């Protein structure tokens, strides 16, 4: 997992509440267990006018010109501002995978579904809970201003607008540490590799019967 760095990015507004995970990445695209390749089907039923299927050539599909992510001014957006209860519905990990694969690094909303919120941190995607009134202003300003950008500083836990207005946000200290240091669950485990190795060696001495083959010979290490 990459370290989360301070950055300034283009904002895309998604002025909808209760966006569920099936809207984020429809069920027909869940067959893959890889984390990559989902970005092209993010919000598939809203981005395209035809029905999407795995393996379908994206270049041949008809874009919905009214959908926010298809508008030129929001190309390259790294921050998504949404409404209440973002990520509700089924607990598919593919939803944050699709958002990240598209290019988003931060999602700002008044509230998130719990499982979606937790899944975001596991892959290095930062979900920021912000007051509804602040989200209102961000969506309004983004719609009114081409190239609207926000600066996100996780270390200081701040979001800064082009006018210099600073909004603070809360984040669990452990999750913050993991994002800043690029540590997912595997990375955290590998920090204790020496202790794990020592434990396994000692366990062979204490419980040798666990390491015997059916014929009584010791398993190779």
Swiss-Prot record:
Its EC number is 4.2.1.33. Signal peptide: none annotated. Keywords: Amino-acid biosynthesis, Branched-chain amino acid biosynthesis, Leucine biosynthesis, Lyase. GO terms for cellular component: 3-isopropylmalate dehydratase complex. Pathway: Amino-acid biosynthesis; L-leucine biosynthesis; L-leucine from 3-methyl-2-oxobutanoate: step 2/4. It holds the Pfam family Aconitase_C. GO terms for biological process: L-leucine biosynthetic process. It is an enzyme of class 4 (lyase). This is 3-isopropylmalate dehydratase small subunit. Catalyzes the isomerization between 2-isopropylmalate and 3-isopropylmalate, via the formation of 2-isopropylmaleate. It catalyses: (2R,3S)-3-isopropylmalate = (2S)-2-isopropylmalate. Heterodimer of LeuC and LeuD. Belongs to the LeuD family. LeuD type 1 subfamily. GO terms for molecular function: 3-isopropylmalate dehydratase activity.
